[in-house]
Amino acid sequence: MKEIRRKELQAGIVLLAAFALWTVLIRHIDVQNAGPNGTEIGIATINVWFHRLTGVHMLIYTITDWLGLVPIIICMCFGVLGLAQLIKRRSLLTVDSDILLLGAYYVVAILGYLLFEMVPINYRPILIDGNLEASYPSSTTLLVLTVMPTLKYQADRRIANPVIREAITVFVIVFTAFMVIGRLISGVHWVTDIAGSVSLSSGLFLIYRYMADDFDLKKTTLKAEESDGVQ
């Protein structure tokens, strides 16, 4: 079990390193003025080819844009859970460690998004309402892949009913697949921008899950030691 958890942490770090390398490659490999208004696009040959293959589908873009509210609502629900624990237990230190870590995890993802909004790597392949918008990493894809796995993870931890857990698992898989594929074929992002979101969000989630499980293990070990001391 310990070996599996260690490999999970390593996988998370590797994915974050891959995201950093991917970002550098996009800035320096096959850069062409292939975007709207002549904006520079990295790995342009592949990006332009895939964009022409899928075309632009604004209906899919609009649907996935509105469905982006779902993970936001889920974040708010976890926030309410943490606040309820804080009010009831009257100390931040008594809030469940996995919820505190979840809040920190969401903050890190938000900061990453804001950073790339301020320092654009790629712009969208189309203008939105006549304006250029940053596209890397895809914000909606990042939001979905950051939040939805945590819904399944928290459900597995907190819900005893296996039917409800299974229903949540199916919902998470179907919703996530629809959103990622939808953004991919909608034509509002370059394919490299979707790939960047997948790598970043996956790496962050694996590290979050490792840390949450590690806190649980330490807590269990501490309780066992205290119990042995009492005996």
Residues covered by each model-derived region:
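Hydrophobic alpha-helical bundle signature of multipass membrane enzymes
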Residues: K2-S135, T141-I168
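Membrane-embedded catalytic cores of phosphoryl/pyrophosphoryl-handling enzymes
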Residues: K2-Q10, L25, I128-Q231
